[in-house]
């Protein structure tokens, strides 16, 4: 077939060259955005008198027809037409005649594809924000049910201090809240229009870029035509934000995997989110959590891939930028899928409160409570730390725990120890007493839950 840009060429490319250069196999995902962008463009052309109202109406009718066909997956794309833009233009001309060729007046594929991706990410980021809020809602519900569920808090994966399970869950709530904030802030840079920037230098036609942007629901335009067609920082920002979100999900999944093991038994995954072994009949594997952890790497890869593509490109457009889409599409699909799976997995898991409680009954996670006890009686904390360290050493040598040490032994270490010491050794009491702002104390958790509910708003109770 003849190319829409083929006027200056005398030889046709080999079929394998066409296939190598074509992007229609993946950029057809932009079909709705491409057609909607074209409708806005031709509407602006008519307003400015660049095409007649009759021509614009005929073009819009043709585009609306193609849009409906696209929604029903009835469009047939060809490699020969290279990309989504030329495929749609070719179909339009076939549908309404040569007047369809006027659609591209005052526009280049360079600003057209950038516009498509802005519109695509606008829709997808808003969906990801909603999915993240739904996951946060599940965390709120789990936290409400586990305010007084006591578990070990860890540093270096060693038991450190007793905490509320709700406190642990809410840590991820606030991480996700920052993820939401990052996505919301990125919409300021996504919701601007490159349309009308042309190939790189603008156009001689008296277009109205602000009007086109308004029709597309965007909040403004790029102020520099070179910038508009040659940068992909809005995609990089999306990939970066998504990498941080996936890192948070991956860390949580790592803990879920550990907690569901026989060594911990803190939680049990629902059968819906676990699989078995083809050889070992007893196995219940946390495959969905492992997949989320694994898929985090591919999102990182998409970010670094595009950063590497962009780092050496001179202004303005270069064909290298065709590599900006597949990683973006893959990241959207991966993030949306992981958020959905994560929400279901957390909503249906069973919390083994007894096992969590047992894990802090016979250990040394209450050692800091004793140091704080001495410090509250006026002893410098460093001296208190030294005394408690010796007590822990004494216990490990005797095969006992701090709760088993008689008061006489405590008094040998410091006369500040009294009978009330044993009250602070209780894990429940230790958690309850940590009532500083943002701490694991029950009253602080209740305050945090109220704030969290206010942030997820309409999703609470769903």
Curated annotation (Swiss-Prot):
Cite the Gene3D superfamilies for this sequence. Answer: Fumarase/aspartase (C-terminal domain), Fumarase/aspartase (Central domain), Fumarase/aspartase (N-terminal domain)
At the top level, the lineage of the source is Bacteria
Protein name, entry field: Argininosuccinate lyase
Species per Swiss-Prot/TrEMBL record: Bacillus thuringiensis (strain Al Hakam)
**Keyword terms:** Amino-acid biosynthesis, Arginine biosynthesis, Cytoplasm, Lyase
Tell me where in or outside the cell this protein is found. Cytoplasm
| Family per record | Belongs to the lyase 1 family. Argininosuccinate lyase subfamily.
For this protein, the Enzyme Commission number is 4.3.2.1
Q: Which GO terms describe its cellular component?
A: cytosol
Query: What Pfam families is this protein classified in?
Result: ASL_C2 (PF14698), Lyase_1 (PF00206)
